[in-house]
């Protein structure tokens, strides 16, 4: 599973390098995934809002073919929405780790 698959992302965008650059810029500057925000929502019992917060980051990751972040985000979202079981704290750690890795990788693109 790849952190960022630039070629696959370009395929999805019909090889539009300019659009990919815009999406990367948006991910770096507008898509902020903060672990503390997510943990606060969960602590307040706002699991629906927490799932939506995760979903937004996961969706951005999907557009950019960030397979690891997309996968960990989907796993966490599924647990938050009650679709599957799992350890929420460890899933948060995994998603946050994948997010940080994706940030580093995409900055090289």
Q: Language-model segments: what does each one mean?
A:
Residues 46, 53, 91:
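DHp/HisKA histidine-phosphotransfer helix
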């Amino acid at each position: 599973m790849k952190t960022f698959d630039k070629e696959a992302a370009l395929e999805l965008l019909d090889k539009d390098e300019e659009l990919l650059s815009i999406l990367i810029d948006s991910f770096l500057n507008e898509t902020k995934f903060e672990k503390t925000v997510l943990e606060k929502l969960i602590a307040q019992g706002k699991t629906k809002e927490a799932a939506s917060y995760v979903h937004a980051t996961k969706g951005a990751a999907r557009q950019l073919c960030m397979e690891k972040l997309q996968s960990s985000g989907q796993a966490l979202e599924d647990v938050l929405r009650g679709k599957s079981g799992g350890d929420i704290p460890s899933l948060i750690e995994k998603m946050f780790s994948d997010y940080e890795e994706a940030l580093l990788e995409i900055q090289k693109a």
